[in-house]
Amino acid sequence: MKPNTLPVNFNTIPMELKRIPRWVLWRLVEVGDGENKKWSKLPAQPNGQPASSTDPATWTDFLTAQSAYENDPIKFSGVGFVFSDEDNLIGVDLDDCFDNLTNSFTNAALQQLATSLDGYMEVSPSGTGVKIFTRADLKSAHVDHDKGLEVYPRGRYFTVTGQRLNGSVPQDIQDITPFIPERCTQKDVFRRCQYVDCKDGPAGFAYMGSGHLCCCR
């Protein structure tokens, strides 16, 4: 069964993100076979063609992405923002740490990290995760799946729900070193990108061919 996702509240998305033309749309598509089958957030352009978090030609401006989503909420599940080398914006992804029904954290360690970091914080589409948009001088991704912590400076897009918890995008670069565990592995974000076969997507869905770059959280 297709998972439920939170609707997008465009009014609460920070202007610091809206004014940057690095937006995509995304749709939940079931990929894989048998026990490996899972729902994946595949990026798309407003015309329905595949988008890539490493190809600026497939990105668009905020208003175009918003219009495409609002005009066809069945085709698109939401919108997303791409991180790149153009600026110092980074994304912090905290997995399985939040209960949207009680509007509270379920992981004390990740809650402490989130409340200590200056940035715009919102609930993920699933309602169980938290994303933070901030600024930092970071060259590589830092990933610790055991702790549910991922930090990306480029080559990724984050879904954006506008389901704001608190905070705003800071103007100054933040020192996030204390928030990255020593065991957290540095990764080249481009190596973490993977191709997925989209042939099992819904009929008529634009993701076709042998595979398309899916770099998202």
Across the structure, where does each feature detected by a protein language model lie?
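Conserved phosphate/metal-binding and DNA-contacting active-site motifs used
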Residues: 1-194
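Low-complexity basic/metal-binding stretches
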Residues: 184, 188-217
